[in-house]
A protein has these predicted regions:
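Positively biased amphipathic helices and basic secretion/translocation or surface-docking motifs
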Residues: 2-33
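Generic alpha-helical secondary structure signal
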Residues: 5, 12, 18-19, 38, ...
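Low-complexity, intrinsically disordered regions enriched in charged/polar residues
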Residues: 10-14, 43, 251
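Compositionally biased amphipathic helical and low-complexity segments enriched in hydrophobic
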Residues: 21, 44-46
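Hydrophobic alpha-helical transmembrane segments of integral membrane proteins
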Residues: 37-44
Length: 315
């Protein structure tokens, strides 16, 4: 394995947004991405707020009609062990990485290795998902991974040895295939998360100060860079502060943190700024606030992840 710092130095290159978007989409971003106060238009639960904002002249009605925000979709870039890459979308194709067969279809990408004895040398693949994208991957052991917008994973094409280890930056949800003899390890820049078989969500964006590990079922052990260990039970979440190295464990409603993989955002008493942090990655927009006081407005509700934002503007 490459040392951890070397791996995460590679992550930084994937957050050169101009390069990434140019490779993935090859088109310029329109000026609609820079609409001031876009934070107050992307949620269907904000009817009363929108009316208030119109009255105060913060976001004129004629300006709202100019906005066209599309939801994200299945797209990513696959980088093979030889350094070549392929753009991924919900189309059917097969390809080979050495002797390993990779199948892509509308359900995502899957790795099929019939004879692992032919794959003794460890080869790695990488999947990079841009803003406005998502992708689903099934590893060779059957583990399923939902990769959210602006995220990256690196993994062996075939797992060898006494553990199954992958590297993650951004947000992923995992359904880990049980294997009592080979624990599954998720490496983030600051944490190692070890499981035998379970369902959990990891949110570890480089531009966010906290790393979240949310357990749905099973049991996970989390080791931080200071050597401290925490063991999570179902419905528990570990919050790790990447700035001071401290962590806390709390009980949560897991739906709030994993519903994105099922096409829904669920909010309960959340600040508008925190909500828009999620929305901005999915709709691929940059959020600006003319009035900073709206950041602290609290909302509860549900937002369909695949809803065209234009329909959300009609109040």
């Amino acid at each position: 394995y490459q040392d951890k710092e070397a791996v995460y130095r590679r992550f930084d290159s994937y957050y050169d947004f101009d390069r990434l978007r140019g490779a993935i989409r090859g088109r310029k971003r329109g000026m609609w991405k820079y609409v001031a106060a876009a934070a107050v238009i992307a949620l269907p639960l904000l009817v009363s707020l929108l009316l208030q904002i119109r009255q105060e002249g913060i976001f004129p009605e004629e300006r709202m009609r100019e906005i066209s925000l599309l939801p994200g979709k299945s797209m990513a870039t696959l980088t093979l062990s030889d350094g070549s890459s392929k753009l991924l979308s919900p189309e059917n194709f097969d390809l080979m990485d050495g002797s390993k067969r990779i199948v892509n279809d509308p359900g995502g990408l899957s790795y099929q290795v019939e004879d692992t004895s032919e794959c003794m040398e460890t080869a790695y693949n990488e999947i990079t998902v841009p803003r406005g994208g998502e992708y689903k991957v099934t590893l060779d052991d059957g583990t399923r991974i939902w990769v959210n917008s602006e995220s990256y994973i690196r993994f062996p094409v075939v797992f060898h040895g006494d553990e199954r280890r992958i590297w993650v930056s951004g947000e992923v949800f995992l359904e880990v295939t049980k294997d009592s003899e080979r624990p599954f390890v998720v490496n983030t820049e600051k944490l190692d998360i070890k499981v035998l078989g379970t369902q959990f969500n990891v949110r570890a964006y480089p531009d966010e100060k906290c790393i979240q590990t949310t357990l749905v079922e099973g049991c996970v052990r989390v080791d931080n860079s200071l050597g401290e260990v925490a063991v999570l039970a179902p419905s528990e979440q570990l919050l790790y502060n990447a700035q001071n190295g401290k962590h806390e464990v709390r009980e949560v409603d897991t739906e709030l943190y994993v519903s994105w993989k099922d096409g829904v955002y669920v909010f309960v008493s959340q600040r508008l700024e925190d909500i828009m942090l999620l929305i901005s990655k999915w709709y691929d927009v940059d959020v600006f606030y003319q009035n900073s006081t709206v950041k602290d407005i609290i909302f509860s509700g549900r937002l369909k992840r695949y809803e065209n934002a234009e329909t959300l503007l009609k109040v």
